[in-house]
Regions:
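Conserved GNAT-fold acetyl-CoA-binding loop/helix
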Residues: 25-44
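Acyl-donor (CoA/ACP) binding surface of acyl/acetyltransferases
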Residues: 1-16, 20-23, 53, 60-175
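Residues that form generic nucleotide/phosphate-binding pockets
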Residues: 20, 29, 44-47, 167
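A short helix-loop-beta-strand connector motif used in the catalytic cores of GNAT acetyltransferases and
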Residues: 45-57
Length: 175
């Protein structure tokens, strides 16, 4: 069984975020619409308002850290959030992306069952589109450069997600 541990971001994560920001492509992909850089990163990490920001760890059966990532849910309107997330470039993608997404989204829906979550996927990233559609996202809009997808709890509770949930354990940690 794969173990996922999530916690709210704090200033203890500053080095993790600085490492992420050293990767130009990674920084652009996640934050090109936000005026965030290393200079105001501390304020960004601790300023949550209605946003929800998590750092997640994937731990194997022996207790070894396998992957580190983050997921940010930006408040749009009541019961609606926009989601961005990523894996730390240093540990980039051991093949756990779908498992991590399902663990994170399961936790979010446990905490806030009525929310809708949207995200955008660039058209060159067909692999991400395929996995998000399997999770239950549906395409609600298309632009020249990307698809906009939305997820509800009803669509998330599908057979594929159910099978994956049997293979994972997730928790919210205070650490």
């Amino acid at each position: 069984m794969m173990h996922f541990s999530f916690r709210h971001t704090s200033l203890a994560d500053i080095d993790f975020y600085i490492e992420c920001f050293r990767n130009d492509e990674f920084q652009y992909m996640l934050y090109h619409n936000d005026p965030i850089n290393v200079n105001n990163l501390e304020r960004y990490i601790v300023k949550n308002d209605k946003d929800i920001k998590f750092v997640g760890s994937i731990i194997d059966e022996s207790g070894n850290l396998k992957d580190v990532g983050f997921a940010h849910f930006y408040f749009k309107e009541e019961n609606a959030y926009t989601y961005v997330g990523g894996i730390h470039p240093k540990y980039f993608n051991h093949g756990y992306g779908v498992y991590a997404s399902i663990a994170m989204l399961s936790l979010i829906y446990d905490l806030m069952p009525n929310i809708k979550i949207s995200t955008g996927i660039y058209k060159h990233n067909l692999r991400s589109l395929k996995s998000d559609l399997a999770i239950g996202f549906t395409i609600i809009k298309e632009t020249n450069e990307k698809w906009i997808l939305e997820l509800t709890k009803e669509n998330f509770n599908n057979n594929f997600v159910g099978r994956v949930k049997l293979k994972i354990k997730y928790q919210l940690s205070n650490i």
